[in-house]
């Protein structure tokens, strides 16, 4: 092995980890000098330097999530359904706030079960999100997955998340049946029951996919503060508010509320914001 190589941590297990290096998966161990550091803790997704099978350096992370523990995420793939279960707007918007605050580059939204009867007004609300640069895909079990959807995974580290019942597993199976088999193999214990497992990355289309069984961000610390800064579409408006700590409700010269009154920002979305923080 050359003196200096770089790999990506796929799975971290106690004192060793699985690393994707040179198109193969190897087992590597952090050097003792790294382990002795008080703040040292490897994360799935870490970019690491390798020398003779040992991890000698962890490169700076561009972002990191705590649930699941994964670093250097390129995109969060948010999966929702309009019906069965009905779309939970507050949960969806909370997730967008959380991931916006974590500096995730892209958050494509996938809407499943579009072959079932749904309220067209709910679909229109989703379409409203496109003006804020969210990619939106509608998928049905009766139609092939759009090529534009498959292309978003190319050479990216993608994390899947979605509430139970929205069809996340079915979607992963349609993308690549072998991925679902690998994920299920990790999430079944010796009694055949599903269990929460270690976060693991799987290679896909030159990038990596991370599934998140049971991942839900319902309670977020400092939600009111985060939402005021990172709610959908607020990022380009908050600098024009009179107060730097504006909560966009009753404050003087608030650019957000002015935009709502002038129909420059969707009123239904603003009402969801107020419901979220109050």
From Swiss-Prot:
Positions that bind Zn(2+): 241, 246, 248, 254
Cofactor binding summary note: Binds 1 zinc ion per subunit.
Enzyme class label: hydrolase
Residues the record lists as binding GTP: 112-115, 162-170
Domain CP-type G span(s) in chain numbering: 62-218
GO molecular-function terms, A-Z: GTP binding; GTPase activity; metal ion binding; rRNA binding
Keywords recorded for this protein, A-Z: Cytoplasm, GTP-binding, Hydrolase, Metal-binding, Nucleotide-binding, Ribosome biogenesis, RNA-binding, rRNA-binding, Zinc
GO BP: ribosomal small subunit biogenesis
One Gene Ontology cellular component: cytoplasm
Cofactor(s) recorded in Swiss-Prot or TrEMBL: Zn(2+)
Record-listed E.C. numbers: 3.6.1.-
Highest taxon, organism lineage: Bacteria
Listed Pfam families: RsgA_GTPase (PF03193)
Cellular localization per UniProt: Cytoplasm
Known partners and oligomeric status: Monomer. Associates with 30S ribosomal subunit, binds 16S rRNA.
Name of the featured protein: Small ribosomal subunit biogenesis GTPase RsgA
Gene: rsgA
């Amino acid at each position: 092995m050359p003196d200096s190589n770089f790999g990506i941590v796929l799975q971290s297990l106690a004192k060793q980890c699985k690393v994707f290096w040179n198109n193969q998966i190897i087992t590597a161990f952090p050097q003792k000098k790294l382990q002795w550091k008080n703040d040292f803790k490897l994360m799935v997704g870490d970019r690491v330097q390798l020398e003779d099978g040992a991890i000698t350096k962890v490169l700076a992370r561009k972002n990191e999530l705590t649930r699941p523990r994964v670093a250097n995420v390129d995109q969060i793939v948010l999966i929702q359904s309009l019906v069965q279960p009905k779309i939970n707007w507050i949960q969806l918007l909370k997730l967008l706030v959380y991931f916006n605050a974590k500096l995730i580059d892209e958050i494509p939204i996938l809407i499943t079960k579009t072959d079932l009867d749904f309220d067209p007004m709910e679909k229109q609300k989703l379409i409203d999100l496109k003006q804020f640069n969210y990619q939106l895909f509608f998928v049905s079990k009766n139609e092939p997955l759009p090529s534009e959807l498959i292309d978003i995974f190319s050479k990216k580290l993608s994390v899947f998340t979605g509430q139970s019942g929205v069809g996340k597993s079915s979607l992963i199976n349609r993308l690549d049946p072998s991925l679902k088999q690998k994920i299920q193999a990790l999430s079944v214990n010796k009694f055949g029951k599903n269990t929460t497992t270690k976060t693991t990355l799987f290679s896909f289309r030159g990038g990596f996919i991370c599934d998140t069984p049971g991942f839900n961000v319902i309670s977020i610390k400092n939600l009111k503060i985060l939402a005021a800064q990172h709610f959908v579409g607020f990022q380009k408006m908050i600098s024009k508010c009179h107060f730097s700590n504006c909560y966009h409700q009753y404050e003087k010269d608030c650019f957000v509320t002015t935009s709502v009154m002038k129909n420059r920002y969707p009123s239904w979305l603003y009402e969801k914001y107020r419901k979220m923080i109050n």
